[in-house]
């Protein structure tokens, strides 16, 4: 089955500090409040990943996250689904989990 990460406040803070310039941290943290859905921390982590350290891209990701949170999560956690015909289902799940954890735990 597909890997579903558990994301904590500490994880979000760690990812922010790791992937974004220090001078942007307060601005980015202030945007977290706009995410009001059930999977809030998971969506914030996905936005951080998808934006790749770019604050403007992060803002764009976050601006659609409440309405399109599944797409946001899918882009971050399950990028191989778009190329599904190239892989077996097990390969897709294994590789997606591997790529997400590689980013999440570095």
Task: Specify the residue positions occupied by each region the protein language model found.
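Residue-level signal for secondary-structure boundary elements
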Residues: 24, 28, 55-59, 70
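Short terminal alpha-helical segments
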Residues: 1-35
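Amphipathic alpha-helical packing elements
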Residues: 43-65
């Amino acid at each position: 089955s597909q890997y579903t990460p558990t994301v904590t406040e500490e994880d979000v803070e760690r990812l922010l500090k790791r992937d974004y310039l220090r001078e942007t941290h307060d601005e980015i943290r202030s945007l977290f409040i706009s995410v009001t859905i059930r999977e809030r921390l998971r969506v914030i982590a996905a936005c951080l990943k998808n934006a790749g350290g770019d604050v403007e891209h992060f803002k764009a990701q976050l601006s659609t996250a409440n309405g399109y949170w599944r797409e946001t999560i899918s882009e971050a956690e399950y990028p191989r689904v778009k190329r599904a015909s190239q892989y077996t289902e097990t390969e897709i799940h294994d590789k997606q989990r591997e790529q997400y954890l590689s980013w999440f735990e570095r």
